[in-house]
Each structure stands twice: as structure tokens, then as C-alpha cells.
Design a protein with these regions (language model features):
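Structural signature of the two symmetry-related core transmembrane helices
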Residues: 178-193
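Multi-pass alpha-helical transporter architecture, strongest
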Residues: 67-82, 246, 271-292
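Intracellular juxtamembrane helix-capping segments at the cytosolic ends
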Residues: 9-24, 215-229
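Helix-loop junctions at membrane interfaces in 12-TM secondary transporters
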Residues: 1, 194-206
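A membrane-interface helix-boundary motif in multi-pass transporters
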Residues: 50-67, 257-276
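Juxtamembrane intracellular "pre-TM" segments in multi-pass secondary transporters
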Residues: 78-121
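Helix-to-loop junctions at the C-terminal end of transmembrane segments
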Residues: 51-52, 162-175, 260-261
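Helix-loop boundary and gating motifs at the non-cytosolic
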Residues: 113-152
Length: 292
């Protein structure tokens, strides 16, 4: 698990930076590329729910094979000049006569408007981490099987497809803060619907995966690519990964575990939903104040 977390956390930001830049250069819609991952995830979770529930160890062999193929495909990726660091000329020390390389310092982002976006990213990951971590346990507590978990996860993945088809129109029509506010609000609504423990309402909660997580993911990745300084795209995406997979995931797991132990999983869903609404309101007000 440690090895997976270390390598996955390091590879994903660089992968996002490369894919977004290559999509822009070749004029390919990034949403279509992301849709391939959505469809494959839907197929995998549906298969796992029905066929691997009695042989769960096969999942690890399957994941290992997929990561091996992923590594081989990465070897075919072309170089991307936009992700290279901008090299400043070396300076000569007048005393020693030797050249000294300048440190790669300076701001990563062009504007402080990025900080409310990072707060939205943290809030989304905080909520989705608790949601995902305790969804399976919650279903088992209610007496449902792993098959239902596979179906629900498949529904959530398929709900991302309409969003990916429309995300460029939405991005042109609405500002980033408006989209992120709506996305985190949908995440809070998902938690409230899931707490009902009713299968139709839980399915409705999964249908909000696209309007919540996918909108937040797409807006954050593409916005950061526009807001980074030249040569610091990978650092910008790494900052997003630290906020999401680092701070957001860790907080969601630790605080979520405390809430689940103290109040129960269902009550934890409701508490975190209200926390998300509070954070969203604060970030939205801050973003509006900065613009004004």
C-alpha cells in the first residue's frame, strides 16, 4: 500500500500535466481523453462487484497487470517542452571565478486567485474520501452485498460521461468559482442522500458523481494549467495533488474515522455534508471579495 501511494501520488500530477498539454497542442478535447478512463472504470467496478466478490485476491493481480501496461504506455509518451523548467543563466562568482547555477525559485502561480480554487479542491477530496472509504462498510451495515456496491460505482462512473460531453460549454459560460461552488454543493447533497440508506436515493447520490467530482477535477486541472508560471506546470499539478491526495485524503480518512467511531457512519455523512457547505460558502465569499 505504501509503495502504491508513493508512486501513484508522484505519477498522477505529471501525467495530468502531460496529457492536458498534449491535448492542447494537438487540439484534442481533453474531456474525450478523460472519458476513456471513466468508461474503463465503470466496466472494472461492475466486473469486480459481480465476479470477484468471492475471489477478491484476483483484483491485486489484475491491478498489477494494468499498472505494467500503463508503465509501458508511458514509455511511448513524447517529450513536452511546456513541462520543462525554465533554466536561468548561471551566474559567475567574482571571488572564485566559478559559475553557480541559480536555484529554481519564484512563485508557481501567476495570481493568488488560485488559493480559493485549492480550497474547493481540498473540500471536494475531503468529502469524496469519506464517501468512498465508508460506502462499502455502510452498505454491509445495511445488509446489502458487494454486488450492489459494484452497481452503484458503475452508476457513478457513467454519470461522468454527460458532464464530460458538456464541460467545455459550461466552462465557457460560467466562471471557475461558480462551477466549483456548484460541484462541492452537489458533493454535500450526495452525502445527505446516501445517509438515507434507501437504494433509490443512494443511486441518485451516485448519479451526482459527474456534477460533483468530475466538474471539480476538470476545472481544477485545466485552471491550474492556465495559471502556472512558464515551466512550472508539473509543480502546479503537484501542488493540486498535495492538496487533494495529501491534505484532503488524509483529513477525510482521519476525521472521518473519528466521526464514524463517535457518532456512526450515517451521522458522519451528515456532519461532513454541513462542513462542506460551510467551506464552500467561505471559499466562494473569499473568491468574490478578491475579484472585487
Amino acid at each position: 500500500v505504501i509503495c502504491y501511494a508513493l508512486f501513484n501520488s508522484a505519477v498522477l500530477p505529471v501525467c495530468d500535466a502531460l496529457v492536458v498539454n498534449q491535448a492542447e497542442e494537438k487540439r484534442i478535447n481533453f474531456a474525450w481523453i478523460r472519458m476513456c478512463g471513466t468508461i474503463s472504470y465503470a466496466v472494472i467496478v461492475l466486473g469486480m462487484g459481480f465476479y470477484l466478490k468471492k475471489r477478491i485476491n484476483l483484483m491485486f493481480y489484475g491491478n498489477s497487470a494494468c499498472f505494467l501496461v500503463f508503465a509501458l504506455l508511458c514509455l511511448t509518451l513524447p517529450g513536452d517542452r511546456k513541462t520543462w523548467k525554465v533554466q536561468e543563466p548561471d551566474t559567475k562568482n567574482p571571488d572564485t571565478g566559478k559559475f553557480k547555477a541559480k536555484a529554481d525559485k519564484g512563485p508557481i502561480f501567476k495570481s493568488k486567485e488560485i488559493y480559493p480554487v485549492l480550497v474547493f479542491a481540498f473540500a471536494m477530496q475531503f468529502g469524496i474520501n469519506y464517501y468512498s472509504a465508508f460506502l462499502g462498510v455502510y452498505l454491509l451495515e445495511l445488509g446489502y452485498s458487494q454486488s450492489l456496491l459494484g452497481v452503484l460505482n458503475c452508476i457513478s462512473a457513467l454519470s461522468e460521461i454527460p458532464v464530460l460531453l458538456l464541460i467545455h460549454r459550461l466552462s465557457r459560460r460560467f466562471k471557475e468559482t461558480a462551477l466549483l461552488t456548484a460541484a462541492v454543493g452537489c458533493m454535500a447533497l450526495r452525502l445527505i442522500l446516501l445517509s438515507a440508506g434507501n437504494v433509490p436515493l443512494m443511486a441518485a447520490a451516485q448519479l451526482l458523481q459527474g456534477p460533483s467530482y468530475m466538474v471539480c477535477y476538470f476545472v481544477c486541472v485545466t485552471y491550474i494549467n492556465r495559471m502556472v508560471m512558464p515551466g512550472k506546470i508539473s509543480q502546479g499539478q503537484s501542488t493540486l495533488a498535495v492538496v487533494q491526495m495529501g491534505a484532503g485524503s488524509l483529513s477525510g480518512s482521519l476525521l472521518g474515522g473519528v466521526l464514524a467511531s463517535a457518532y456512526g457512519i450515517r451521522e458522519g455523512f451528515l456532519i461532513i455534508a454541513f462542513l462542506l457547505l460551510a467551506v464552500t460558502a467561505a471559499a466562494g465569499i473569499t473568491a468574490g471579495w478578491r475579484r472585487s
